């Protein structure tokens, strides 16, 4: 897929996420690998109003190559890609219901959601709860790395999900 098409796809996905109420305001971010780096939604962007030309393009050390300044949570995406090299995309949201689950008392941090359906078990397996870190705290990347090798989805306490896929 061309970088131009990938940029359009990120914007379409962002709009879909926003229209379904899974993101509001300037919350959440989406990234995808391209031939010579990766694309990420810019800092402060609204997923419902993304501009393909303004997406951030970064190298594999997190250095901005072109576009607007990247989300301050770029390090989360990079941590997922480093641990899950076969995955081509990462989505991080602050969706209301997932944040609500992330603050519940008495949940099993090894698997925060019970296996409600067979499909959930087949697709997700278990969903670990990553302890709370302040937004932008680089220690969060290391905490995510600790789970990402075995899980393509994690739930950040008081924050929201990070999911890697193709």
Segments and roles (model prediction):
Residues 1-166:
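Glycine-rich flexible loops
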């Amino acid at each position: 897929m061309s970088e131009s098409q990938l940029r359009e796809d990120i914007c379409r996905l962002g709009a879909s996420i926003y229209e379904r109420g899974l993101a509001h305001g300037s919350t959440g971010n989406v990234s995808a690998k391209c031939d010579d780096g990766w694309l990420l939604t810019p800092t402060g962007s609204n997923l419902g109003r993304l501009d393909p030309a303004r997406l951030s393009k970064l190298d594999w050390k997190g250095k901005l190559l072109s576009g607007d300044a990247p989300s301050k949570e770029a390090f989360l995406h990079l941590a997922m890609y480093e641990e899950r090299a076969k995955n081509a995309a990462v989505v991080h949201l602050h969706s209301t219901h997932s944040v609500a689950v992330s603050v519940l008392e008495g949940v099993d941090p090894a698997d925060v959601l019970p296996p409600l359906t067979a499909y959930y078990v087949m697709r997700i397996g278990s969903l670990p709860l990553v302890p709370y870190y302040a937004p932008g705290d680089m220690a969060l990347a290391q905490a995510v790395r600790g789970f990402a090798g075995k899980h393509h989805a994690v739930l950040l306490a008081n924050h929201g999900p990070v999911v890697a896929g193709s």
